[in-house]
Swiss-Prot record:
Source taxonomy: Eukaryota, Metazoa, Chordata, Craniata, Vertebrata
Superkingdom of this protein's organism: Eukaryota
Keywords (A to Z) from UniProt: Glycoprotein, Glycosyltransferase, Membrane, Signal-anchor, Transferase, Transmembrane, Transmembrane helix
Main EC class the enzyme belongs to: transferase
Protein's name according to its UniProt entry: Glycosyltransferase 8 domain-containing protein 1
Amino acid sequence: MSFRKVNIIILVLAVALFLLVLHHNFLSLSSLLRNEVTDSGIVGPQPIDFVPNALRHAVDGRQEEIPVVIAASEDRLGGAIAAINSIQHNTRSNVIFYIVTLNNTADHLRSWLNSDSLKSIRYKIVNFDPKLLEGKVKEDPDQGESMKPLTFARFYLPILVPSAKKAIYMDDDVIVQGDILALYNTALKPGHAAAFSEDCDSASTKVVIRGAGNQYNYIGYLDYKKERIRKLSMKASTCSFNPGVFVANLTEWKRQNITNQLEKWMKLNVEEGLYSRTLAGSITTPPLLIVFYQQHSTIDPMWNVRHLGSSAGKRYSPQFVKAAKLLHWNGHLKPWGRTASYTDVWEKWYIPDPTGKFNLIRRYTEISNIK
């Protein structure tokens, strides 16, 4: 065998060995990326970061991931933190939090999530672009809080969680006392893109709004004097549902173009004013009621025990509150504010802001009075 042939053989073997090592390293890297669940391919609202190295408390790698979407605005950040903390401590499931916020809140949120008490949490911070709402929302000073951009994040779930087939959305004014896996396993009927808790269920008493009648049916949210609403042939007495907590089948959501349907009714409301003038609930409710009319499944009412923020009085017994799977302080009185019912239950899950920017108003007031 000539010297030239020997060199060629050695070169071929060297190249083969190099490719073998490269292939092995590539497989290892791919496995690592899968295990750490990194993802930067979201179109629309952009992921700011993801923390893959969080310690997991005995999570089986074969478990299905449970995406939980929650909006976190700067002035309500403590609420989102308490909600996340309560979910994490009451489950052993593989939960990933998609925390939707605005750019100016991301750093504050990130520093809070780096607290020792929250280091086991797996999360992704997703920036919501308010430009998505241009031409779809009109300014209304009477709506105040519900007009903020993040209120509408729930309409864009397939964009926020692009790779998931199913997800949970919940507001920031909740505390979870049950295992979130049970809510995630809610059975949705064929063709249904979401499951909500209806306002006529037995767990939540009916709310009477001054000037609006009973705020638990469609007529409380939509203006039935408008021809476009009447043409939909929706019964005004139909029980409404609460959009603050729901389970979404994202495959079905995409198939039915739910986001596009919701945007259509948002635009029509800007042009024609289709929502009830006595609307007391969230401004996100009317378009959801239209799109999901007789086309939604239901969740266990104990997974959305609400109206805790409607008054300072305790409308539920301590025993009932303890048995609830999820407590919801919807209404004007928030558990981080001056007064609300069962603030002690909420405060159990609250973690103080390490930056000192967010304070419980009642505590701050008490300290000021002492001084």
